């Protein structure tokens, strides 16, 4: 599979091969660096990578199975660098079902991070709330959500 190509829903065992190949490409680009912490940057958090030092940037176009992002403001790259002396992998831009991606594509980066040895993952996103006390930029911890995709995220084989 070449960079940027879609991962077929019917790929089955092929998805594991895509994850392995993507991981190999990322490892090669990182050399000796092996971050253990990753953050998925949601809308409005792209600036985070600008605060990192000693960075290595890998555009999605160079990672097998990673499609281009279509959401404005989503960088479309992995950035590994240091924050407070800690090595961090930042995913700048992600893939969404509403862009036409299958669930196995939407979770491809997270599964690849696990294959890379990431031990801690922080997921961020833009979210709305019904409380009038919520203002733009309010940090929230989400305990549940309304799933309007009509897809169960728990279906499929467990690996």
Q: Residues of each region from the PLM?
A:
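Metabolite-binding pocket within alpha/beta catalytic cores that recognizes anionic/polar moieties
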Residues: 2-159
